[in-house]
Curated annotation (Swiss-Prot):
Bias type Low complexity, positions: 598-611
Region entry Interaction with VP16, spans: 389-543
Ranges annotated as biased composition (Acidic residues): 738-747
Record region (Interaction with CREBBP): 395-545
Source superkingdom: Eukaryota
Name of this chain's protein: Mediator of RNA polymerase II transcription subunit 25
Residues with PTM Asymmetric dimethylarginine: R725
Keyword Transcription regulation: yes
Quaternary structure, from the entry: Component of the Mediator complex, which is composed of MED1, MED4, MED6, MED7, MED8, MED9, MED10, MED11, MED12, MED13, MED13L, MED14, MED15, MED16, MED17, MED18, MED19, MED20, MED21, MED22, MED23, MED24, MED25, MED26, MED27, MED29, MED30, MED31, CCNC, CDK8 and CDC2L6/CDK11. The MED12, MED13, CCNC and CDK8 subunits form a distinct module termed the CDK8 module. Mediator containing the CDK8 module is less active than Mediator lacking this module in supporting transcriptional activation.
Length: 747
């Protein structure tokens, strides 16, 4: 497929959110291998920009996200109706999830719980939307694979979409611009009706006839927003040049999944001459071998009238046109023929997951590690001990290419009074390459300077990451504290950008250091397009600064309180001024408690240290803090019903924003340069004496409104205590690491 057309070169450069919703019953089990080979793997290859390979660097950074939802029937009780996998950007890992599905149960049922699966998929897309706030709109695809119609029952397990029927859910999918596709081994009218109801508003015109582009005449394949790697015969000339002359069994590659394949163009006759060097006996033998393979896979004989035409003219003809087999291996995915745009080492960068607990599946990689606040699987404290740090992946089978020192800067672990204080750390490190590779490091400097970048800013650079070579970094644990700090930062939403000075006469100008939490190794990516990569980083940082500036302007216009419940604006302004300032410490992006969002990776200021008071902070004399009161048996004003909005604020305090903010001096890293101070000048309100150090959050100068009596002093401390609420902050990782002071040198 030529670049720019509907092929993998185009799809691989698009950031997509892909959710497969699969029926996990025995009704689908006998057919799944054929569907996987003909449709699912080609679809994954389309989004991945090439065949999934184990060398894909996935799981921590990157663009396209894959997630898997497996639903069952009502006879699976007491088990849950739905199993959900946390999103991953590794296409290879996603394929291992597909291979690990256990198709069991459902034998006595004629329907399946499609509504439960689709409601879970919609919740995943809600999580994707929060994760993608930095890069905006993505290409979203929901693929339903099932072999039974839906129950006439609403969804019950989903919290957000409980009570919605299957038709309601597919209508919501279409209205949100999510491309809905269906793959089934049978032609079920109920499923076709769902596909038609999921049509986006812009595509309400009558569907064109050739929508069913199945490989097998019994299959039903209805797709939107998705094509196979070879496209629909729209460019027969270039396709001819890429067809292998021996024509191995071509059928497994699957049909083109475009909704309306174009008709063959005039230069078709030359393609009929492609197999001219093959005798009729060879063609017949290939057809017989293919039929035997299909029967062995449980698919039955092929549709014989079409097979000779497909063998003679690959890539041309009606919707049953075939693709060459090397585009997709029938077994575990390898990389026999990646597209020209992709390199042998397919590197996939990953955005943080949505925090859903991964379900263990046979054959799936180990999911060791704890879920950090950004949704990234980070090293657990036990893994950060000396034995784990010393046991980095063996590099005995690799060649040493460079040895030197890596230096970076981070905020000191205890909150410093001076916001500009930085701690410089360095570690001896070695760079290793595989045998047979040659990396010219003679001109590399002895010390490499690394700058930290939030991983969320790198999601649009996926194609540049794929077009790069991979090296492995190994750090010695002479300085255990620095090594722990590197693990902590790199495992919680950051990538390292290593700049080579212009004075060094080496070919490499920039190198990206990434940490794989699954493989527990540090990988260095050296993009082949150095200038393009530098320009890409500069562009994403510029865009990030523009977004920050817009948010700052919105806050200055009085829009900083968007996280409060609706209707509380006047109350926050007139009656709880410190609460408004507390809300302004966070960007105006709502974040539900039930989802571990990409808080640590969005590049936004997140006061991760506010859930607990800083060291040395007073434990709150009565009336010391007047933010929204914590839930529990607290003393409220005597007549909260006099103001319904105030009552709503008291009964439903805003989530994690509550707490004591850091001192004014340490708030500088939460504001872009030149921003006005967020906290008002201190007041000595309510006649309370100032005990100990100055109060972190002065009380307001005014008391409650005239219609309410003054708030009685609260006994004990008012600070939040007990268990964490909402996303749990990662101790030790300072939020200032992700702000503009780190990114300035990259502009």
């Amino acid at each position: 497929m030529v670049p720019g057309s509907e092929g993998p070169a185009r799809a691989g450069s698009v950031v997509a959110d892909v959710v497969f919703v699969i029926e996990g019953t025995a009704n689908l089990g006998p057919y799944f291998e054929g569907l996987r080979k003909h449709y699912l793997l080609p679809a994954i290859e389309y989004f991945n920009g090439g065949p999934p390979a184990e060398t894909d660097f996935g799981g921590d950074y990157g663009g396209t996200q894959y997630s898997l939802v497996v639903f069952n029937t009502v006879d699976c009780a007491p088990e849950s109706y739905v199993q959900c996998h946390a999103p991953t950007s590794s296409a290879y890992e996603f394929v291992t999830w597909l291979d690990g599905i256990k198709f069991m149960g459902g034998g006595g049922e004629s329907c399946s719980l499609i509504a439960e699966g689709l409601s879970t998929a919609l919740q995943l897309f809600d999580d994707f939307k929060k994760m993608r706030e930095q890069i905006g709109q993505t290409h979203r695809v929901c693929l339903l694979i099932c072999n039974s119609p839906p129950y006439l029952l609403p969804a019950v397990e989903s919290t957000t979409y409980s009570g919605c029927t299957t038709e309601n859910l597919v209508q919501q999918i279409g209205e949100r611009g999510i491309h809905f596709s269906i793959v089934s081994p049978r032609k079920l009218p109920a499923l076709r009706l769902l596909f038609e109801k999921a049509a986006p508003p812009a595509l309400l015109e009558p569907l064109q006839p050739p929508t069913d582009v199945s490989q097998d005449p019994r299959h039903m394949v209805l797709v939107r927003g998705l094509v196979l790697p070879v496209g629909g015969g729209s460019a027969p000339g270039p396709l001819q040049s890429k067809q292998p002359v021996p024509l191995p069994p071509a059928a497994p590659s699957g049909a083109t999944l475009s909704a309306a394949p174009q008709q063959p163009l005039p230069p078709v006759p030359p393609q009929y001459q492609v197999p001219g060097n093959l005798s009729a006996a060879q063609v017949a033998a290939q057809n017989a071998v293919e039929a035997a393979k299909n029967q062995k896979a449980g698919l039955g004989p092929r549709f014989s009238p079409i097979t000779p035409l497909q063998q003679a003219a690959p890539g041309v003809g009606p919707p049953f046109s075939q693709a060459p087999a090397p585009q997709l291996p029938p077994g575990p995915p390898g990389a026999p023929k990646p597209p020209p745009a992709s390199q042998p080492s397919l590197v996939s960068t990953v955005a943080p997951g949505s925090g859903l607990a991964p379900t263990a599946q046979p054959g799936a990689p180990s999911m060791a590690g704890t879920v950090a606040p950004g949704g990234v699987s980070g090293p657990s404290p036990a893994q950060l001990g000396a034995p784990a740090l010393g046991g980095q992946q063996s590099v005995s089978n690799k060649l040493l290419a460079w040895s030197g020192v890596l230096e970076w800067q981070e905020k000191p672990k205890p909150a410093s009074v001076d916001a500009n204080t930085k701690l410089t750390r360095s570690l001896p490190c070695q760079v290793y390459v595989n045998h047979g590779e040659n990396l010219k490091t003679e001109q590399w400097p002895q010390k490499l300077i690394m700058q930290l970048i939030p991983q969320q800013l790198l999601t649009t650079l996926g194609p540049l990451f794929r077009n790069s070579r991979m090296v492995q970094f190994h750090f010695t644990n002479k300085d255990l504290e620095s090594l722990k700090g590197l693990y902590r930062i790199m495992g919680n939403g950051f990538a390292g950008c290593v700049h080579f000075p212009h004075t060094a006469p080496c070919e490499v100008r920039v190198l990206m250091l990434l940490y794989s939490s699954k493989k527990k190794i540090f990988m260095g990516l050296i993009p082949y397009d150095q200038s393009g990569f530098v320009n890409g980083i500069r562009q994403v940082i510029t865009n990030h600064k523009q977004v920050q500036q817009q948010k700052l302007e919105q806050q200055q216009r009085g829009m900083g309180g968007q996280q409060a419940p609706p209707g509380l604006g006047p109350i926050l302004e007139d009656q709880a001024r410190p609460s408004q300032n507390l809300l302004q410490l966070r960007p105006p992006q709502p974040q539900p408690q039930g989802t571990v969002g990409a808080s640590g990776a969005t590049g936004q200021p997140q006061p991760q240290g506010t859930a607990q008071p800083p060291p040395g902070a007073p434990q709150g004399p009565p009336g010391a803090a007047s933010g929204p009161p914590p839930p529990g048996p607290i003393l409220r004003p005597q007549n909260p019903g006099a103001n319904p909005q105030l009552r709503s604020l008291l009964l439903n305090p805003p989530p994690p924003q509550t707490g004591v903010p850091p001192p004014q001096a340490s708030l500088h890293h939460l504001q872009p340069p030149g921003a006005p101070a967020l906290l008002p000048p201190p007041h000595q309100g309510l006649g309370q004496p100032q005990l100990g150090p100055p109060l972190l959050h002065p009380p307001p100068a005014q008391s409650w409104p005239a219609q309410l009596p003054p708030r009685a002093p609260l006994p004990g401390q008012m600070l939040l205590s007990g268990g964490p609420r909402g996303p749990v902050p990662q101790p030790g990782l300072q939020p200032s690491v992700m702000e503009d002071d780190i990114l300035m040198d990259l502009i």
